[in-house]
Design a protein with these regions (language model features):
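Glycine-rich, mobile lid/loop segments that gate access to catalytic sites or pores
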Residues: 121, 125-228
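Short, well-ordered loop/turn and helix-capping segments at boundaries between secondary-structure elements
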Residues: 91, 109, 261, 272-283
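Conserved phosphate/anionic-ligand binding catalytic regions in large, soluble enzymes, centered on
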Residues: 87-94, 244-272
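A structural-propensity feature for long, helix-poor, extended segments
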Residues: 284-306
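Single conserved hydrophobic/aromatic residue that forms the stacking wall/gate
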Residues: 1-7, 304-313
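Short, hydrophobic/aliphatic alpha-helical segments
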Residues: 67-83, 215-218, 230-257
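Active-site-proximal helix-loop elements at catalytic-domain edges
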Residues: 32-58, 203-233
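An N-terminal structural lobe/cap that precedes and organizes the functional/catalytic core
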Residues: 10-118
Length: 313
């Protein structure tokens, strides 16, 4: 233990001496500039004249639109908003009614999987959905006649195809693992034309779901749709794609990064959090008690020095 402390101290001294960036962060806590984008922007502090940083309430912008404004509009109008936000992020502008209807139809048309991919998910050995997702994404390369084309139009087509198929892959993988691990009946449901992406995901996952389930999932998808490209998995995709490799290889690399327990893999602890929540909330009718609990638990995002804009939503 003593020797480990010495190594740790020496490492810290060397990192400081040579200005090694830990976690893509400068010593003052600001992010390392690795690229420029107008797609997503994270704001968590403001610079003080003369030096230093001042924490401010976190803000997240999609193509210049405040995420909170987008989310509140979706909630107020009681509609499903993920497809609209995906269109905004991909194209740079919000769709009109006809464009949104066409985009939703395009998403639904691309949700079904190739029969070979479907069977491979069922037959794959393993107990981790993220690994199955990465392998399934790599397999999509086989069925794409223009897999290595990195032109803008083709990248757009591939992106829409991936957005469409992710819910199907994940739902099928979950049901397969539940069947293989817990002996549950295996149900493979086809996506429905009249459902939103969030509704289709829940339908394929468990068929019986409430409208609250679907609207909550839709909101979560909106909140997680983009994060500026500076976290580990999106940075991994940036590095991988900079070599000119195909889209599927780059996205699979990002999934591998996201799986890590120090990044998206931390989501596996959500189940534990629910148990913790049940043990620590005494009155489920007390909104203030529930709000205090979630504020305390969620106010720990490294990208924000004050509460994340996602917390309140």
């Amino acid at each position: 233990r003593g020797l480990g402390d010495v190594y740790k101290r020496q490492e810290n001294e060397l990192f400081k001496k040579f200005d090694v960036k830990r976690g893509l962060r400068n010593e003052d806590g600001t992010g390392v500039l690795v690229g420029l984008t107008k797609i997503g922007n994270v704001v968590g502090y403001e610079r003080i004249p003369g030096g230093g940083l001042k924490p401010i309430p976190g803000k997240l912008f999609y193509r210049g639109y405040d995420l909170e404004d987008l989310a509140h509009a979706i909630l107020k109008e009681k509609r499903f908003g993920f497809e609209e936000v995906a269109y905004l992020l991909l194209s740079g502008r919000l769709p009109d009614r006809e464009e949104l209807a066409s985009f939703r139809e395009l998403i639904n048309d691309n949700m079904p999987l190739e029969q070979k991919t479907k069977m491979n998910i069922i037959e794959l050995e393993g107990n981790n959905i993220m690994n199955i997702l990465a392998r399934s994404v790599l397999e999509m390369y086989r069925f794409d006649p223009n897999a290595d084309d990195t032109s803008r139009d083709n990248l757009m087509r591939q992106s829409i195809d991936l957005i469409s198929k992710f819910p199907t892959i994940i739902a099928y993988a979950f049901n397969m693992l539940r069947h293989a691990t817990h002996g549950r009946s295996l149900h493979i449901r086809h996506p429905q034309e009249n459902l939103s992406l969030a509704e289709n995901f829940l339908y394929m996952l468990k068929k019986d779901y409430t409208e609250l389930d679907a609207r909550t999932l839709d909101l979560l998808l909106v909140l997680q749709a983009e994060h500026g490209g500076g976290n580990n998995s999106t940075f991994t995709v940036r590095v991988t794609s900079s070599t000119g490799t195909d889209t599927y290889s780059a996205i699979a690399a990002g999934i591998g990064s996201l799986k890590g327990p120090l990044h998206g893999g931390a989501n596996i602890q959500v189940t534990d959090m629910f148990h913790h929540l049940q043990e620590n909330i005494r009155d489920w009718t007390n909104v203030d008690e529930i709000d205090t609990y979630f504020t305390r638990m969620l106010n720990n995002c490294l990208l924000y020095t004050s509460p994340s804009p996602r917390d309140g939503l």
